[in-house]
Regions:
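Structural preference for beta-rich elements and adjacent junctions enriched in aromatics
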Residues: 1-214
Length: 214
């Protein structure tokens, strides 16, 4: 899969960003890998492009149950309505960007689920987050026709254990997920299938290969 390059767009130029995303085909995050135990599957898709300076990623979510109780970055964001992006720029390490529907983010550089270094506040502040829900405002679970979008603008420097200065030409592996561990209907969806007995997103052997257009 190739990530298209669209140069000259600033993340804060929302009209230009929306226009660029309109030309990108959405891809489903629809692999329900453990249907016997976790059959519930909200509708989730993502779109992605890069400018060289920024990786632009948008999740669109339609779900029945939504909650946002985590109020701090690097907290237990996976317990809320959470969209996740994992990327491995090489075989030795991967990064997990886990973001709730109100923009609280966990970011780590990892060799495995248990071997991790969390990003500093300065690195986290460099990742721009835009959500259609009130950003940063927590709420208990809501049941209904809940629809929300989350856009991330990720600079290459967010891969803080690598010396990246430009996304152009990068070859990597990635997977994208949607979860909500503490919701009344927990779910664990992925873009690429995960072939494990129990839910486990920290499995880079199941990532898909991607190339960022030069």
């Amino acid at each position: 899969m190739e990530i298209r390059k669209i140069a000259g767009i600033a993340p804060d130029d929302r009209a230009a960003v929306d226009e660029a995303f309109a030309g990108i085909e959405p891809l489903p995050v629809a692999c329900c890998n453990w249907p016997a135990e976790f059959p519930y599957a909200p509708e989730v898709s993502f779109r992605m492009f890069h400018t060289g300076d920024w990786l632009m990623l948008r999740f669109d979510v339609a779900e029945r149950y939504t909650a946002a109780l985590v109020t701090e970055d690097n907290g237990e964001v996976w317990t809320d309505s959470c969209a996740e992006f994992f990327i491995a720029p090489d075989t030795g390490m991967y990064y997990n960007f886990e973001t709730t529907c109100i923009g609280r983010m966990l970011l780590g550089a990892r060799k495995s689920r248990t071997e991790a270094e969390h990003a500093s506040p300065e690195v986290l502040a460099g990742v721009k987050r835009y959500t259609t829900l009130p950003c940063g405002e927590p709420f208990a679970e809501r049941e209904g026709d809940n629809r929300w979008s989350l856009t991330l603008a990720i600079p290459p420097q967010a891969l803080f254990r690598h010396a990246l200065t430009d996304w152009s030409g990068l070859k990597a592996c990635m997977n994208l997920y949607k979860c909500g561990d503490n919701l009344s209907h927990p779910h664990f969806l992925s873009w690429r299938p995960i072939r494990t007995e129990k839910p486990d997103f920290h499995r880079p052997e199941f990532f898909g290969e991607v190339t960022f257009e030069k």
